[in-house]
Amino acid sequence: MMEGLGEHSTAGEMGPLLGAVAATASPQSLMEYSSDADFIESLPLVVKYRVYTLKKLQAKCAVLEAKYLREFHSVERKFATIYGPLLEKRRQITNALYEPTKEECER
């Protein structure tokens, strides 16, 4: 038996179930998922507080990560428009559609 799975479950029972839930669930619903709610309820109050606090912190991390990814995507889009003309010019040169001038060849 693996640690943390409770007395009544085995790693074989939990593995596929957790994988299926993780593959289709949003971060918020995954945070609420509990394979053994009775196990959590049987924990001492101090430990339950830790578990719930950790879940709350993880949810805040998920919100921050979503914000980071939105901003990262925004920066990628901004630079894609800046890189666009340069990449197009490079494509034209490599496909012999454009011949650089003497000035463009100088360093």
From Swiss-Prot:
Annotated GO biological process: nucleosome assembly
Pfam families for the chain: NAP
Record's GO cellular component terms: nucleus
Superkingdom: Eukaryota
Family in the record: Belongs to the nucleosome assembly protein (NAP) family.
Protein name per Swiss-Prot or TrEMBL: Putative nucleosome assembly protein 1-like 6
Provenance organism: Homo sapiens
